[in-house]
């Protein structure tokens, strides 16, 4: 498996397209090998689950509000009609500091809608240092394609 030894082809495709859809073997290991190769090439990497991502662009790049779980407690006039809102810093804020390339690997990407996947592609085109890999399901062997190609079909 020369791909897992070097990762050059994967890195070239990632740099050319910006956003890739990956089908990885279910036993795992491929994502960490490729992330290790990307780190060796100078990328700053992060591995996240796509579940609970919400609006991907806002979650990743902007300061946004979240509501903590209710847990059955009564509020005694401490919040608005919609409940307490806490402000959260952007998740990619610290990674985008500096000049290094950033690679974000999203697990369980099959739960994302078409519009969310399109917004991830748009985010990659607006931020030239950001590369996003979305795991779209399992396969017997590692394969990938540009996200734009997946969305077109």
UniProtKB/Swiss-Prot annotation:
* Known EC number: 7.1.1.-
Q: Which reaction does it catalyse?
A: a plastoquinone + NADH + (n+1) H(+)(in) = a plastoquinol + NAD(+) + n H(+)(out); a plastoquinone + NADPH + (n+1) H(+)(in) = a plastoquinol + NADP(+) + n H(+)(out)
Record's bilayer topology term: Peripheral membrane protein
> Sorted alphabetically, which InterPro entries does this protein's record hold?
NAD(P)H-quinone_OxRdtase_su_N
Primary location group:
membrane
Alphabetically sorted, this entry's keywords are: Membrane, NAD, NADP, Plastoquinone, Quinone, Thylakoid, Translocase, Transport
What GO molecular function terms would the record report? oxidoreductase activity, acting on NAD(P)H, quinone or similar compound as acceptor; quinone binding
Annotated compartments: Cellular thylakoid membrane
Q: Which Pfam families match?
A: NdhN
Oligomeric form and interacting partners = NDH-1 can be composed of about 15 different subunits; different subcomplexes with different compositions have been identified which probably have different functions.
Assigned protein family? Belongs to the complex I NdhN subunit family.
| Full protein name | NAD(P)H-quinone oxidoreductase subunit N
Provide the taxonomic classification: Bacteria, Bacillati, Cyanobacteriota, Cyanophyceae, Synechococcales
């Amino acid at each position: 498996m020369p791909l897992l030894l070097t990762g050059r082809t994967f890195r070239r495709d990632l740099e050319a397209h910006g956003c890739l859809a990956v089908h990885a073997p279910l036993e795992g290991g491929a994502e960490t090998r490729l992330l290790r190769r990307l780190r060796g090439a100078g990328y700053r990497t992060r591995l996240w689950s796509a579940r609970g991502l919400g609006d991907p662009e806002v979650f990743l790049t902007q300061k946004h509000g979240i509501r903590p779980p209710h847990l059955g407690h009564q509020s005694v006039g401490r919040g608005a009609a919609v409940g307490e809102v806490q402000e959260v810093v952007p998740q990619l804020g610290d990674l985008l500091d500096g000049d290094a390339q950033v690679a974000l690997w999203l697990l369980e990407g099959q739960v994302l809608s078409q519009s969310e996947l399109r917004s991830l592609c748009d985010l990659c085109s607006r931020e030239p240092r950001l590369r996003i890999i979305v795991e779209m399901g399992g396969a017997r062997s590692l394969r990938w394609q540009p996200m734009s190609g997946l969305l077109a079909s």
